[in-house]
Amino acid sequence: MADKKAPAAGWPVANGEYVVGNPESCVAVVTLGSHGLDQAAIDAGAAISGPCHTENLGIEKVVANYISNPNIRFMVITGSEVQGHITGQCIKALYENGIGDDGGIIGAKGAIPFMENVGTEPVGRLQSQIVECIDLIDVEDTGKISDAIKNCISKDPGAFEEEPMVIELEGGAAAAGEESTSIKPTSPEMALLEARMRIVSEKMNEAAMIAKFNSGYYNGKIQGIAIGLFLSIVIFSLL
């Protein structure tokens, strides 16, 4: 039997609409925007299963719950993709590419894919701990999902060698004896506001560039007309 470790006290550490199974299971499931899939995932042997609707705060909670349980080594992304947020693709991009210096998920296509409370260390831990990400985005067939979970369990490599990493998303204290990363919490409202301000700033810069181009274009056009009229007058005066 594969070696197992105790997850962080009170696991899952981040609250949400999760269904929790055996915490020693090596599989965690994200059901994105679908409903009614979580219990089937738990029945198939998953440690935790739940939806993820947003590409920022929602993903942060997924990361927090996964890295605080070293037994989780496989991540199954399934269920219907969340329109606009494109959360499934963002989670996959986070696992494959990580985040940039600004906290943005590299290669993510969601509206606001920024990690405000999760830094490079927790993301790196997720990338090291998870040995395989199974892409079943837009799959709602419980049979296929169950088969994927059971296949992962058959390949269980055992618990990750490091202790649980606890992220204080909401200012909670880490339990004694656990590896913790203290991150200054940001309220959901501020996180979204800052991200939207960045987007507005980018749009304003784009608009300024377009306005500058148009201004130069029209100024050049007027100058061309003036020069043409001047040359016409000169030519007619010589006739």
Curated annotation (Swiss-Prot):
It is found in: Cell membrane. It is an enzyme of class 7 (translocase). The chain crosses the membrane at residues 216-238. It comes from the Archaea. 5-hydroxybenzimidazolylcob(I)amide binds at residue 85. It is a single-pass membrane protein. One of its GO terms (cellular component) is plasma membrane. One of its GO terms (molecular function) is cobalt ion binding. Belongs to the MtrA family. The complex is composed of 8 subunits; MtrA, MtrB, MtrC, MtrD, MtrE, MtrF, MtrG and MtrH. Part of a complex that catalyzes the formation of methyl-coenzyme M and tetrahydromethanopterin from coenzyme M and methyl-tetrahydromethanopterin. This is an energy-conserving, sodium-ion translocating step. This is Tetrahydromethanopterin S-methyltransferase subunit A.
